A protein has these predicted regions:
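An internal, D/E-rich "acidic patch" concept
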Residues: 59-116
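Membrane-interface helix starts
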Residues: 10-14, 63, 105, 277
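Hydrophobic alpha-helical transmembrane segments of membrane transport/permease proteins
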Residues: 16-65, 162-178
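Hydrophobic alpha-helical transmembrane segments of multi-pass integral membrane proteins
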Residues: 17-21, 105-109, 148-155, 282
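Hydrophobic alpha-helical segments of polytopic membrane proteins
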Residues: 6-8, 13, 153
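Alpha-helical transmembrane segments of integral membrane proteins
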Residues: 2-3, 93, 97-130, 146, ...
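Peri-membrane helix termini and adjoining interfacial loops of integral membrane proteins
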Residues: 43, 151-163, 254-262
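Membrane-water interface segments at the C-terminal ends of transmembrane alpha-helices
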Residues: 22-29, 58, 72, 136-165, ...
Length: 313
């Protein structure tokens, strides 16, 4: 186990190098930088001032020199200074994490509470009205884009009924209701279909028939055996969703002005704020590697027959 965990952490190094290098290259290929976005290119500011500012930030250096300087800063705990705000990148990024963490926890909780019971119900009521109705709901939820759901909820609950604020501050549960519902609609629809399919597959297995023959109640079989066997699929979905949510949901955060990591990333990309963009890239890489590692460990805990690829230490 220890060797496996160490191996996965070591795998993070080439992943980070590859991802950061590619993102650095793509931003340069884009053809403009933060100075162009800040001062414009219409001649409003003297070219000498623009060149001096670009030299001050090191943007006049060769690409490889800039990249190595940034990597060296990371290794010493310095992620640089934001080109636009002038604030420390690490502090700026960390200040946005609480809002993203709050939205992640609420969205996952809402999704689990909606999708698992409904998915199980649809499987138990297979090919009956309840099943058809829930499958229709799932189809609609999967078909609607997040931005449309967000605007619809905002129109109804914020503008028409004035129950929730139009603009969220990213710190209170009340302001998180609409962003959470928006995310939960699509996620619940997807989860419900997967839970239904997995539970339905388990219900048709021989051990379920054997338990029924021994007189075990259907509800006990469902919640203690079938659902436990279905947990691997649910954990996989949760892992993917947690990774994307912790990376910030750019569209939803931008619509609701939710002051989280996703909105920060959009603003940084728009303004070509390289240090902030690179901080976001590193964060996403770390999140997905860690989520995948935790998922593998949970797989092994739930089903010891699953091997982790190395001998146990």
């Amino acid at each position: 186990m220890k060797k496996y965990i160490l191996k996965r952490f070591l795998q993070l190094i080439p992943v980070l190098i590859g991802i950061t290098f590619l993102s650095f290259a793509m931003m340069r290929i884009a053809g403009s930088d933060a100075i162009t976005e800040l001062y414009g290119d219409k001649g409003a500011v003297a070219q000498e001032i623009i060149d001096a500012k670009r030299a001050e930030l090191g943007l006049d250096q060769p690409f490889l020199t800039q990249y190595l300087a940034w990597v060296g800063g990371i290794l010493t705990g310095d992620m640089g200074i934001s080109y636009i705000s002038g604030r420390d990148v690490f502090q700026t990024f960390v200040s946005k994490l609480p809002a993203t963490l709050l939205l992640t926890v609420l969205a996952i909780c809402a999704t689990v509470m909606i999708s698992i019971p409904l998915g199980v119900l649809a499987a138990v009521r297979h090919d009956k009205f309840t099943d058809y109705f829930l499958r229709f709901f799932s189809f609609i939820g999967n078909s609607l884009p997040n931005f449309f759901v967000a605007l619809l909820l905002m129109q109804v609950f914020s503008i028409h009924w004035s129950i929730f604020p139009v603009i969220s501050n990213g710190t209170t549960v009340q302001s998180a209701v609409l962003p959470t519902l928006t995310l939960a609609v699509a996620m619940s629809a997807k989860y419900m279909r997967q839970v239904r399919a997995t539970v339905l597959e388990e219900l048709n297995k021989d051990y379920v028939e054997g338990a029924k023959a021994r007189g075990v109640r259907g509800r006990v079989i469902l919640w203690k055996s079938v659902l436990k066997s279905s947990m691997l699929t649910i954990i996989t979905l949760l892992a993917l969703s947690i990774g994307s949510l912790l990376g910030g949901t750019a569209i939803i955060e931008s619509i609701f002005m939710w002051d989280g990591v996703g909105k920060l990333a959009v603003d940084a990309i728009t303004m070509r704020d390289y240090p902030l963009i690179q901080a976001y890239v590193v964060w996403m890489a770390i999140i997905y590697v860690m989520v995948n590692l935790i998922t593998d460990l949970l797989y092994h805990a739930l089903d010891p027959r699953i091997r982790l690829g190395v001998s146990e230490a």
